[in-house]
C-alpha cells in the first residue's frame, strides 16, 4: 500500500469475512472516474439505510475500521455494495477461505454487472511440497495441479487493476499472494498496440515471448499465440476470446477480438493493451543478476553441508539448484521460481 493511503475494514459478522476499501483522495471532478452501477431489484430497508449512511460517512472521514453486524440473511453484502457505490473507489474484499470468496464474488458480480468484479484466490487444486529423505537419498518432487480457470481469473484481476479503471472490485482470500512476482515487472511487460502504428511483426512476436506467451501454431490454448503470415492470433491468458492482430508490412492494420471456435469477429479496437501470461514476471537483467547471487549462495551452502559431513544433502542441493539455474538461463523461468523471489525483488 502506498504511503498515506488509508482504509476502512468492515466485518460482515464473526468469522465471516471482511472488506477493505482503499481510501484514496477524491478527484476534483468525480465524473473523471469510472462509476459503480449498482444493479438490484431490492432497495435498502429497515436498518440498512442508516448503516449505509454511517459506513459511507466513516470512509469519507478516514475512519480506519468500522464493523457491520448482522445475522445471516440480513443483507450485509447488499449493504456493503451500496457503500461501494457511494464511495466509488477500487475495493478489495478479503475472505478467510476460497469457498466464501467464491460466494461473495458471485454476489458482487450480480450487484455490479457493468463493472470489473474480479476473483483472486490460490489457484492450486492440489499441492504437495517437495521433500528429501537423506537416509535413502530420495527426493520427492513438488507435485501440484493448477486450476486453469482460476489462473485466468487471477490474471484478469491483475489486468483490471493495471488498466487504470477505477470501478474495480477484487474478491480475494487471505492467502492469495503466493507465487506473485513484482507488480512493476508485470506492468513493464504490458504490450500496447495501436491501429495504424508502425510496429515490426518480428519485434511484436519477441515482445509476446518476453511476456511469457508461447508460440503454438497447431493447438492454440490460453497463453499461446500462432502466426499465419501477417496475422497473429493471441489466446489471452486472462480472457475467453482470441485477440487477432493483422499487420500490413511494419504497420498494424487491424485489432479484433475473435471467437476461438467460430472465428467470428466480436469487437474491433483502435488500441489494446496485452497483459503478460504469468503473474511472475521479471527482466533478463534481473534474471542474470539473480542467477549470479543464487550461485554464490549455492556454493556457500554446499560447502557448509560438506563441512558438516552431509554429502547427500550437498549433492541433492547442487543438482536441484543447478537444474533450476539452467532453466532460468534458457527459458527465463523454472518450476517453483517463486521460491527464488528474494533474489529477484529483495524479499526477505
Say what each PLM segment does.
Residues 3:
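Cationic, low-complexity basic patches in intrinsically disordered or flexible, solvent-exposed regions
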Residues 32-348:
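ASCE RecA-like P-loop NTPase motor cores
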Residues 9:
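Exposed substrate/partner-binding surface patches
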Residues 13, 28-29:
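Intrinsic-disorder-associated, low-complexity terminal segments enriched in Asp/Asn/His/Tyr and depleted
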Residues 20-22, 30, 53:
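Residues marking helix boundaries in flexible regions
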Amino acid at each position: 500500500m502506498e504511503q498515506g493511503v488509508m482504509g476502512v475494514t468492515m466485518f460482515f459478522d464473526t468469522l465471516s469475512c471482511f472488506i477493505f476499501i482503499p481510501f484514496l483522495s477524491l478527484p476534483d471532478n468525480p465524473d473523471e472516474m469510472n462509476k459503480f452501477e449498482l444493479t438490484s431489484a431490492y432497495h435498502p430497508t429497515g436498518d440498512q439505510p442508516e448503516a449505509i449512511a454511517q459506513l459511507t460517512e466513516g470512509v469519507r472521514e478516514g475512519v480506519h475500521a468500522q464493523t457491520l453486524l448482522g445475522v445471516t440473511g440480513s443483507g450485509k453484502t447488499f449493504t456493503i455494495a451500496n457503500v461501494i457505490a457511494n464511495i466509488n473507489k477500487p475495493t478489495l474484499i478479503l475472505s478467510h477461505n476460497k469457498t466464501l470468496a467464491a460466494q461473495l464474488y458471485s454476489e458482487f458480480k450480480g450487484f455490479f454487472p457493468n463493472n470489473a468484479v474480479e476473483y483472486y484466490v490460490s489457484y492450486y487444486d492440489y499441492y504437495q511440497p517437495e521433500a528429501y529423505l537423506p537416509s535413502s537419498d530420495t527426493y520427492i518432487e513438488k507435485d501440484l495441479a493448477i486450476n486453469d480457470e482460476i489462473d485466468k481469473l487471477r490474471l484478469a484481476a491483475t489486468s483490471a487493476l493495471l488498466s487504470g479503471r477505477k470501478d474495480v472490485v477484487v474478491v480475494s482470500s487471505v492467502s492469495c499472494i503466493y507465487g506473485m512476482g513484482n507488480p512493476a515487472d508485470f506492468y513493464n511487460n504490458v504490450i500496447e498496440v495501436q491501429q495504424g502504428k508502425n510496429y515490426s511483426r518480428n519485434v511484436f512476436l519477441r515482445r509476446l515471448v518476453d511476456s511469457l506467451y508461447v508460440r503454438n501454431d497447431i493447438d492454440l490454448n490460453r497463453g499461446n499465440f500462432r502466426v499465419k503470415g501477417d496475422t497473429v492470433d493471441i489466446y489471452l491468458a486472462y480472457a475467453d476470446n482470441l485477440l487477432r492482430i493483422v499487420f500490413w508490412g511494419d504497420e498494424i492494420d487491424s485489432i479484433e477480438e475473435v471467437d476461438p471456435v467460430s472465428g467470428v469477429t466480436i469487437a474491433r479496437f483502435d488500441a489494446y493493451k496485452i497483459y503478460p501470461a504469468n503473474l511472475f514476471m521479471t527482466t533478463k537483467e534481473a534474471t542474470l543478476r539473480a542467477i549470479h547471487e543464487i550461485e554464490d549462495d549455492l556454493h556457500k551452502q554446499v560447502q557448509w553441508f560438506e563441512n558438516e559431513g552431509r554429502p547427500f544433502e550437498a549433492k541433492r542441493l547442487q543438482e536441484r539448484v543447478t537444474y533450476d539455474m539452467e532453466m532460468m538461463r534458457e527459458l527465463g523461468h523454472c518450476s517453483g521460481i517463486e521460491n527464488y523471489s528474494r533474489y529477484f525483488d529483495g524479499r526477505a
